[in-house]
């Protein structure tokens, strides 16, 4: 009888030591951050930003080979722990946090598998990494769009040659790049700060670089500071000044990271947002909101007015052809998804690099050197390309569905700010954009 009593008492003791509520999200988040930072040692593109505790950074020398099995086991364990979290008493925001963490972990595991040699189709990769399903378009769709351009562009003959000859009139001279960009940035910041109160110490350093596969990049450094780099490998057209000022700065990546740091990391203590794994659902929101933010900051004709009255003269460009230029650029926007199709076929092994570049030359009217630069981007970032156009469409539809239309700019800014301040994924935005 005595052994049975002792066994019963031991069981009671063990049960009393077990946390009835399961693992905490904070504990899972801390392990997640450490895991992401360790994986980042094996892929320099993986960690886009980190401004969390210094002691969480990996110490010592990394192993010679990727410890994929260890990383996958840890990622899977954290996912299992997420499912064991006691969510009774959770607010809607708490639920959003947990869902976001789960989707980020799925993306982390997927990326580790890819680093280890696993190959996904373009669509599967996009779904697992970015929580989105990219649409498909045929060449017939793009052919019909090109016919609209044919009637607008001056001259006769090859459409790509005519297009590039026309837009080359609107290149910012190299010696005027810095002046034009800084004026565009100042105006973008002024417009953003009217609706989103930014910290007094927020700022970024602007650098001009070469030999990159991208046109611009924001490296967020924490404490409301960023490093923004602009690639000058290829000529930069006048509309790119506002594009990059908004996308990389205000109200794009810089503001997005400032708000996440202030709202989630500093105020709520959610440390998982102090690390940004690039190949994750967070990127679709980041890139989509950065592109949509251009329209939020410079709605309708306001952008054209500012560019014609301020930036064109600063760049020394003839404003007489501006209206035709904007008409052409508006039609070109409809061809955005042609780049996704080129990437899908190329990454699925259906076409070669040269054929992908040829597709871009035909359906995005890219100059040969620009088309080849884009294939370098596909090599480096793969299905990430969907985040710019599909991301923008998802964000735009969500904001406008919630009432943030162009004729209600105050509400548009309010919804946009909320979107930048809280955990959201593509799937959650789509779900909240239907009747």
Label every model-predicted segment.
Residues 17-435:
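N-terminal maturation segment of proteins
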Residues 1-23:
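Bacterial Sec-dependent N-terminal signal peptides
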């Amino acid at each position: 009888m005595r052994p049975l009593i002792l066994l019963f008492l031991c069981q009671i003791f063990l049960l009393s030591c077990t946390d009835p509520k399961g693992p905490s999200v904070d504990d899972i988040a801390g392990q997640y951050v450490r895991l992401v930072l360790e994986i980042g040692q094996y892929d320099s593109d993986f960690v886009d930003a980190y401004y969390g505790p210094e002691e969480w950074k990996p110490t010592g020398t990394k192993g010679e080979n990727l410890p994929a099995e260890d990383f996958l086991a840890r990622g899977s364990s954290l996912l299992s722990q997420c499912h064991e979290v006691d969510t009774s008493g959770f607010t809607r925001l708490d639920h959003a946090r947990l869902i976001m963490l789960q989707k980020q972990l799925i993306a982390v595991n997927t990326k580790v598998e890819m680093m280890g040699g696993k190959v996904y189709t373009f669509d599967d990769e996009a779904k697992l990494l970015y929580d989105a399903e990219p649409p498909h378009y045929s060449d017939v769709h793009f052919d019909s769009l090109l016919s609209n351009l044919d009637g607008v562009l001056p001259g006769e003959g090859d459409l790509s040659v005519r297009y590039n000859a026309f837009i080359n009139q609107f290149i910012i001279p190299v010696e005027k790049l810095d002046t034009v960009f800084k004026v565009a940035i100042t105006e973008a910041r002024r417009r953003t700060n009217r609706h989103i109160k930014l910290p007094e110490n927020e700022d970024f350093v602007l650098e001009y670089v070469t030999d990159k596969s991208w046109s611009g990049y924001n490296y967020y450094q924490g404490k409301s500071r960023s490093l923004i780099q602009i690639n000058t490998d290829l000529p930069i057209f006048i509309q790119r000044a506002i594009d990059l000022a908004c996308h990389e700065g205000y109200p794009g990546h810089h503001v997005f990271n400032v708000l996440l740091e202030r709202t989630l990391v500093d105020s709520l203590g959610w440390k998982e947002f102090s690390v940004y794994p690039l190949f994750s659902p967070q990127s679709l929101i980041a890139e989509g909101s950065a592109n949509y933010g251009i329209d939020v900051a410079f709605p309708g004709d306001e952008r054209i007015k500012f560019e014609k009255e301020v930036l064109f003269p600063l760049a020394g460009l003839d404003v007489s052809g501006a209206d035709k230029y904007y008409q052409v650029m508006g039609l070109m926007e409809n061809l955005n998804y042609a780049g996704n199709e080129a990437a899908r076929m190329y990454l699925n092994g259906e076409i070669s690099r040269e054929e992908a570049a040829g597709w871009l030359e035909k359906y995005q009217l890219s100059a040969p050197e620009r088309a080849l630069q884009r294939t370098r981007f596909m090599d480096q970032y793969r299905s990430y390309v969907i985040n710019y156009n599909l991301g923008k469409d998802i964000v735009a539809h969500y904001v406008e569905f919630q009432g943030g239309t162009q004729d209600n700019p105050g509400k548009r800014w309010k919804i946009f700010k909320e979107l930048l301040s809280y955990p959201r994924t593509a799937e959650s935005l789509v779900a909240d954009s239907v009747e």
